[in-house]
Amino acid sequence: MNKAPLYGDVVSEFYDLLYPPTDVSHVVEYVRSRYPSGARIVDFGVGTGRTAIPLAIAGNHVHGIDISERMIEALRDKDPERGVTTEVGDFTHAVGDGTYDMCMIMNNTFFMILGHEERTQTLRAAYSFLKPGGRLVLETYAAHHYLRESSPITSITPLGAGDLLLLDKIDVDPIKQQLLALRSIVGRGNVATFVEISRFSLPQELDVLGRAAGFDIAERSRNWQGDPVDAAALSHVSEYVRR
């Protein structure tokens, strides 16, 4: 039986175009405001190092875990000085040593963990890495926008220098709390198509999962600058503290 390719292996070539580092300076400042002298950070689903590399340059010790070898290779190509330590592996089963200040799960990665048990395992893994009082940070899209959505959502977005187009068609299942996105990148004489599946949770659901794994919600904002959450927010940054 052929094994399905990993999501990260499929998108690694385009990942930095899909998620340009426009907010990275705010992420760096977010961490600096909590750890002025630098922090030990573990990044679950580190990808190409979009935020991990700038955090390391800013004086933090950053360790990244990703199941996709191609993602890790892309990170290493961008980080020849090896400022970010890396490992290829499934972070849902990772075991830490309790010495880290912060665990970051960025860019909707937590919602791409589809099973309840796998999410619980991920939070337990984060707990094992963190010191008492350490912080778990989840960056997710704002789920409430999709609760009443039943029609497909389509969009066209220029990428990079404008020579590529991203075509998105998102099917929403509000009962299963699931988004299925068919994404195509068109241009340069080529078409690349891939699928993203995510299962969203409301903030209160995340907080219940967190409490069961030993985390208490500390704050939630709509962005890395700390602006308050409201109905118009498109994303949430949720910070939890390890008991």
Task: Give short role names for the model-derived ranges.
Residues 93-102:
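A short acidic, Gly/Pro-enriched loop at the edge of an enzyme's catalytic core
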